[in-house]
């Protein structure tokens, strides 16, 4: 029963990210493999190869934020150590091996991600405002797997 409640709570957290962000990037080993964006009146789903080239684009007609959250949850659960998400505006976050990246480009941590984001292109990263663990608190999904985080 606790596991089911935990799963539902985690899906709710992801749905909140989907609703508040508008764009969610899915990363495997810190490489963007997919993007889900809300555009106009529907969600769009993009996939990329390791060189950040667009592989496919799909219109998810009829999808709801709850459907999208469940899809992301199932994807994360397959490999919570390597699968991460990045959520777009207004709370822009990137999960990179327990590090967050930051708008202060003087921070060392921003440089690698900035290279990745500019190579992916502005159509993928609508907002390059990134946070850092030195400046804000956050929890990566690998830590959310513990049910007591919700108590």
Curated annotation (Swiss-Prot):
Q: Does the keyword Zinc apply?
A: yes
Where in the chain are disulfide-linked cysteines found? Answer: none
Q: According to the record, what induces this protein's expression?
A: Expressed in the early phase of the viral replicative cycle.
Q: Which cofactor does it need?
A: Zn(2+)
Organism lineage string: Viruses, Varidnaviria, Bamfordvirae, Nucleocytoviricota, Pokkesviricetes
Q: How is the cofactor bound?
A: Binds 1 Zn(2+) ion.
MF terms (GO), sorted A to Z: metal ion binding
Protein name per UniProt: Protein A151R
State the oligomer form and interacting partners. Answer: Monomer. Homodimer. Interacts with protein B119L. Interacts with membrane protein E248R.
